[in-house]
């Protein structure tokens, strides 16, 4: 794994709330290797967003703002849905 992906993995595992650490860290472990450079940029942008907002978006409790409503967010929402029932 290259340095950029390792940094993203670390950030995803240490977001601030336990729930986001689990969802985003798990997503990163499962998908970082397959993401394109553009998708990595979008994922990094999501990691910069306020933690409570991210949780509400990926769980579907709040609508995702248009600037964050992209393929990576869809992947995260799907991952979260699949893993929240386990």
Describe each PLM feature range.
Residues 2-86:
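Positively charged, polar, low-complexity stretches
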């Amino acid at each position: 794994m290259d340095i950029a992906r390792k940094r993203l993995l670390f950030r995803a595992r240490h977001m601030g709330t336990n729930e986001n650490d689990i969802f985003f860290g798990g997503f990163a472990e499962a998908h970082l290797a397959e993401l394109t450079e553009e998708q990595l940029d979008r994922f990094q942008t999501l990691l910069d967003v306020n933690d409570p907002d991210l949780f509400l978006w990926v769980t579907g409790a709040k609508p995702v703002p248009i600037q964050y409503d992209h393929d990576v967010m869809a992947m995260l929402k799907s991952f979260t849905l699949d893993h929240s029932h386990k």
